[in-house]
A protein has these predicted regions:
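Short glycine-/acidic-enriched loop or helix-start segments at secondary-structure transitions
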Residues: 6-9, 62-63, 249-250
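C-terminal target-recognition/interaction regions appended to catalytic cores
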Residues: 130-289
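Residues that form generic nucleotide/phosphate-binding pockets
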Residues: 22, 80, 126, 190, ...
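Conserved Class I SAM-dependent methyltransferase catalytic core
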Residues: 1-54
Length: 289
């Protein structure tokens, strides 16, 4: 996931720096890009970091660097210019997922320590969402997607016909009070169990007392998220807890009845980019079941 670029919190960029150093020691050039699928028209706001490495002695590596007019003998300023060209125009990601340089984009150029152990102990770097590493030299800058095509939304992948009753949420499980209430404060008075087992409570903002493992009492708080997912936007990132009683589970308004329900299996398949009924059949000992 994209937080790899910033981990750990006490030594920003160390973990990704170790990965890059290992690739460097094996003779690879590495490009990376944080890509949100929805920013290129897909039906899910799923953000992940993609890493592509290629051996320095391959034809592919030589072709990329030739197009960018890169030379190992360049001074840092010239190297930075050519490495930026790889990121924006000539590199692996640039052709399939085009980007522009962000306005007032922050740029970072840095050398990896020679020893991987030193990277682990001392290295830190403010990695941006795009970058390249060659021979231990890192160049990274913030980019923005360049896409003007069709945008698939959650509404586009929702079923339009009759949906099985098992997916609909009973009214008493939706709300415990006025539907306009989006927060709860349980610091002084805890809500009844029945209220806490509603989607309104789960997705709403809340404050409540908790006790840590060492006995320290503290206030836990979290903000509200949208109760009903909007059909005119791509779906949120779908997790393995989808469909369960979870804060991250999608809730939608059924297109035929207008009632509130969970996503169907078919809709979750579509959000993940699979064909309709992808999981309906499978092969067992050569037979379709």
């Amino acid at each position: 996931v994209d937080r790899l670029l910033k981990s750990p919190a006490k030594q920003r960029g160390r973990d990704f720096g170790v990965i890059l150093a290992c690739f460097r020691d094996e003779g690879y050039t590495v490009e990376w890009r944080v890509i949100n699928a929805a920013e290129y028209g897909y039906q899910q706001r799923r953000r992940r970091i993609f890493i592509f490495g290629y051996k320095n002695d391959t034809k592919y590596a030589k072709d990329v660097l030739k197009k960018a007019e890169y030379d190992d003998a360049f001074e840092n300023a010239e190297k930075a210019c050519k490495m930026e060209k790889v990121i924006l125009k000539d590199g692996f990601f640039a052709k399939t997922f085009p980007v522009n340089k962000a306005e007032n984009a922050k740029k970072v150029m840095k050398e990896l320590p020679i020893e991987v152990g030193e990277v682990s102990e001392k290295f830190n770097c403010s990695f941006e969402n795009s970058g390249i590493m060659k021979d231990g030299t890192i160049y990274t800058l913030k980019t923005i997607p360049y896409y003007h095509g069709k945008q698939i939304t959650l509404g586009d992948v929702m079923e339009t016909g009759r949906v099985d009753e098992q997916y609909f949420i009973p009214e008493e499980k939706l709300y415990y009070t006025n539907p306009d209430i989006t927060h709860s404060n349980e610091i002084e008075n805890k809500l009844p169990k029945e209220s806490r087992q509603t989607w309104q409570y789960l997705k709403g903002a809340k404050k409540l007392l908790r006790t840590s493992a060492n006995g320290h009492e503290y206030v836990f708080s979290e903000g509200a998220i949208s109760m009903i997912d909007q059909e005119d936007k791509p779906a949120r990132t779908m997790l393995t807890s989808e469909g369960g009683f979870s804060r991250t589970t999608h809730i939608v308004k059924d297109k035929e009845t207008g009632k509130i329900r969970l996503l169907t299996a078919t809709e979750t398949e579509r959000i993940q980019g699979f064909p309709t009924d992808h999981t309906k059949y499978c092969l067992v000992k050569g037979e379709t079941v």
